[in-house]
């Protein structure tokens, strides 16, 4: 059965459809929970496919209750291990102290109104089209919220007036050479090793990606754009907005502020979400209409800012 078939059955008060509505609303926490209704899995997969930035971060499930949630962070870590000088000597002492932070849980959703005539007498594809539009709008809204949070956090870390978290580039973006980039990546790898985080990918704004693609050696482009072969230092999929640079995955961050470049460990930012975003509200018997809504709950927070290593280019 399709989503349109489900909506028609739900409008008739079909017991199985009503039960499925409650299961969708309360129990589904991921896209793979063994649910036997194929269209539900398809809905969640379509939502994930349209969230390019959200998908590079860590995901977790929201708690059952609460308008805000707390999460633990490491405040200080003085632990260390050294060689014991001689038998019986005290080992090196250290301790970890923890703190808590809180983040608000926000609601994202929208609805559409359809007449009972459309629900009961139209062909299923017409209903599916309306539902698909809501799914896509939900994906766009939640993806935009995650992008805004990530981009703001990167800029805040890089441009902080006190103890900024950044790597200083040796040149302006326009003047960065392949050697400059290679050194920058090595510096980032060394810093990531010190912080015990992963150098998973380099996230960049559109202008930075264009600058990377424009790198040349005696007129020959460094990047393979055709996909027909491997070039010297990397390749880039112009439609998938992702590629590799010196074996490091590169992801374009759509609509990020100009000059944005940041090495990103997925565990640096966590996205908490509720279950499958589907719910049918009550109809209006005086107008013979039904309101179909899509909604979900989401929270976003920086759970390990050490996993973000922003790049600061020299001013032009």
Predicted regions mapped to residue ranges:
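Extended, compositionally biased alpha-helical segments that mediate assembly or anchoring
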Residues: 265-316
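Intrinsically disordered, low-complexity terminal tails
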Residues: 1-35, 316
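Extended oligomerization regions of viral-like shell subunits
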Residues: 166-279, 285
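Alpha-helical scaffold segments that mediate packing/assembly in large oligomeric complexes
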Residues: 110-191, 314-316
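Structured core elements
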Residues: 111-113, 201-203, 291-293
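Assembly/oligomerization interface modules of large self-assembling protein complexes
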Residues: 19-110
